[in-house]
């Protein structure tokens, strides 16, 4: 198939209010274009001054998504990977903080020849260079760039000016702006109001940018009359006003946009003439499984520190959707605030009533740790399927050391610097690290699985690669003692020094992992550990409390017998 010669740029902006779903829109459009045979990548530009979100509170930023190459990025990159089934990288997320840092570093090195460093041209030129970087280095047909924030925010202005200039540089056939807005429904008046969208476009016009396509979020589908009115007052044809009403699941958005012919409008405006018909049968089948599970429902408790803000666990929640579809069940998540178990009078048995699996979530710091440990003990002693991720695995280690091995003072040096029995300790190469940002063990690392373990059966192979984000690890001084008491170290680093996965002998499904499996779960390839965990919860819910998870639950075939994985 013939390919367009130039990389086409699509910029997605948002107006009226935040959290309209620019990330889902970008990912959905990317999926539609990829299904037509085009090579697509997506990147996110965030206007905040932080260099990256790695040190930001989950309450402010939500989940920090980690890429294979160790970038700490915005959670929207998770949507990009889940929808496109393509890896993102350090180059896929740019913050205004990183832009300013690059400009200041160049000034210190004398690259501006003593000139006055200003937003225009120096900051804008730096942004434009970054905008072209991924397009030049990747083999692409289309590059989609989501600009964070809302039109009218001061922080976003340099990004918008760079986009305006880039359109002049590349030409109107090579750069397109899609503006996402809100058309609210006023119940008292029984009508939709277009004025917020009109004002949002007016503010965008003030920056010198005329949107090429409007996507209008709404509670209900837009009528033709509403589309015509919006187009009339925003300088657009009716066909360039796309409706996007509320969906039962975010995975229904690509199908809705396909019905609205967004991809066709984009192809026409960018002059892309060679493409195939979209192939999304697998996506439609997945959505049907999500909406209409054949085998009922399972409830999984997620015990964490940030449960008041579910976006802190975005990839975990989406992994449950993927795994639920594979197992033909709906996964209902019951959030449990880990600090609740530390309060007097808390009844863990009541909190875990009708729960079929427990996931102890990742996090940092000592708040709520004893609560997590209490819930883990309940799951271990009652044969409830358990999955601990990162901090969850470390808490499981502490619980086992205290209550099975008799190490009453077992703890992590993260929570108690002078603890007498540090079963979890700071990694050796971290002990001299003083800076916080970007200094953890980050990115993808290999792990070797022990034969005939739960992990080995779930993955169906012996060598895996998973993404990490941590400073602390299992202390090998206690390895022999815990192993003698029934803990199984089913996954380690290739040299055997780092414990990556723990299991407990005799428990039907108890797995703790130092890495973050949720970062690699996809619509087309649900993560094996989540699939196995949900399968175990399903068996527990339906009365098979002595489940032994078998690899044929996944379409992976027989476990491989080589380290090549």
Swiss-Prot record:
Binding site for CTP: 18, 153-155, 193-198, 229
Binding site for L-glutamine: 59, 363, 391-394, 414, 471
Additional observations: CTPSs have evolved a hybrid strategy for distinguishing between UTP and CTP. The overlapping regions of the product feedback inhibitory and substrate sites recognize a common feature in both compounds, the triphosphate moiety. To differentiate isosteric substrate and product pyrimidine rings, an additional pocket far from the expected kinase/ligase catalytic site, specifically recognizes the cytosine and ribose portions of the product inhibitor.
Binding, UTP: 18, 193-198, 229
Documented activity regulation: Allosterically activated by GTP, when glutamine is the substrate; GTP has no effect on the reaction when ammonia is the substrate. The allosteric effector GTP functions by stabilizing the protein conformation that binds the tetrahedral intermediate(s) formed during glutamine hydrolysis. Inhibited by the product CTP, via allosteric rather than competitive inhibition.
Function summary: Catalyzes the ATP-dependent amination of UTP to CTP with either L-glutamine or ammonia as the source of nitrogen. Regulates intracellular CTP levels through interactions with the four ribonucleotide triphosphates.
Species lineage: Bacteria, Pseudomonadati, Chlorobiota, Chlorobiia, Chlorobiales
Active site: 390, 516, 518
Region annotation (Amidoligase domain) ranges: 1-272
Residue sites binding Mg(2+) per the record: 76, 146
Stated name of the protein: CTP synthase
Quaternary state and interactors: Homotetramer.
A GO term, aspect molecular function: identical protein binding
Gene Ontology biological process terms in this record: 'de novo' CTP biosynthetic process; pyrimidine nucleobase biosynthetic process
Protein family membership: Belongs to the CTP synthase family.
Catalysed reactions, as listed in the record: UTP + L-glutamine + ATP + H2O = CTP + L-glutamate + ADP + phosphate + 2 H(+); L-glutamine + H2O = L-glutamate + NH4(+); UTP + NH4(+) + ATP = CTP + ADP + phosphate + 2 H(+)
Binding-site list for ATP: 19-24, 76
Pathway terms, separated by semicolons: Pyrimidine metabolism; CTP biosynthesis via de novo pathway; CTP from UDP: step 2/2
């Amino acid at each position: 198939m013939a390919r367009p010669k130039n990389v086409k740029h699509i910029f997605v902006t948002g107006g009226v209010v935040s959290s309209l779903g620019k990330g889902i829109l970008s990912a959905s459009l990317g999926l539609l274009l990829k299904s037509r045979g085009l090579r697509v990548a997506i990147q996110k530009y965030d206007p905040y001054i932080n260099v990256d979100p790695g040190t930001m509170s989950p309450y402010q930023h939500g989940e920090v998504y980690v890429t294979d190459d160790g970038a700490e990025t915005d959670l929207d990159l998770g949507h990009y990977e889940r929808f496109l089934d393509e890896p993102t990288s350090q180059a896929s997320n740019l913050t205004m903080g990183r832009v300013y840092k690059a400009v200041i570093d160049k000034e210190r090195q004398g690259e501006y020849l003593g000139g006055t460093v200003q937003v225009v041209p120096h900051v804008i030129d730096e942004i434009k260079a970054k905008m072209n970087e991924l397009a030049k280095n990747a083999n692409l047909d289309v590059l989609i760039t989501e600009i964070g924030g809302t039109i009218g925010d001061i922080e976003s202005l340099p990004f918008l000016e760079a986009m305006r200039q880039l359109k002049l540089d590349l030409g109107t056939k090579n750069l397109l702006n899609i503006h996402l807005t809100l058309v609210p429904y006023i119940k008292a008046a029984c009508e939709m109001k277009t004025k917020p969208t009109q004002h949002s476009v007016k503010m965008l016009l003030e920056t010198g940018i005329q949107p090429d396509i409007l996507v209008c979020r709404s509670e209900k589908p837009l009528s033709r009359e509403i589309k015509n009115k919006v187009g009339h007052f925003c300088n657009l044809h009716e066909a360039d006003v796309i409706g996007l009403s509320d969906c039962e699941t975010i995975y229904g958005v690509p199908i809705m946009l396909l019905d609205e012919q967004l991809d066709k409008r984009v192809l026409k405006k960018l002059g892309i003439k060679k493409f195939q018909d979209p192939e999304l049968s697998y996506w439609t089948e997945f959505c049907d499984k999500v909406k209409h599970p054949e085998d009922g429902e399972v409830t999984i408790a997620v015990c964490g520190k940030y449960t008041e803000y579910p976006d802190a666990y975005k990839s975990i929640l989406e992994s449950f959707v993927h795994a639920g579809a594979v197992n033909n069940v709906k996964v209902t998540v019951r959030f449990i605030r880990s600090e609740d178990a530390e309060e007097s009078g808390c009844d863990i048995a009541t909190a875990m009533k009708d729960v079929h699996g427990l996931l102890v979530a990742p996090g940092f710091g000592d708040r709520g740790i004893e609560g997590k440990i209490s819930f883990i003990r309940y799951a271990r002693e009652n044969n409830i399927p358990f999955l601990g991720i990162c901090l969850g695995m470390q808490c499981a280690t502490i619980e086992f050391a205290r209550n099975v091995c008799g190490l009453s003072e077992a703890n992590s040096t993260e929570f108690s610097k002078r603890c007498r029995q540090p079963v979890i300790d700071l990694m050796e190469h971290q002990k001299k690290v003083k800076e916080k940002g970007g200094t953890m063990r980050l990115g993808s690392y290999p792990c070797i699985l022990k034969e005939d373990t739960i992990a080995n059966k779930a993955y169906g192979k012996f060598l895996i690669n998973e993404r990490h984000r941590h400073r602390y690890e299992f202390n090998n001084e206690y390895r022999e003692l815990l192993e003698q008491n029934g803990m199984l170290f089913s996954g380690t680093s290739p040299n055997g020094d780092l414990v990556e996965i723990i299991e407990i002998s005799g428990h039907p499904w108890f797995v703790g992992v130092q890495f973050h499996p949720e970062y690699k779960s996809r619509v087309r390839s649900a993560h094996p550990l989540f699939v196995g965990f949900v399968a175990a919860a399903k068996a527990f819910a339906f009365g098979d409390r002595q489940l032994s998870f078998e690899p044929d639950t996944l379409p992976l075939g027989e476990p491989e017998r080589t380290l090549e994985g």
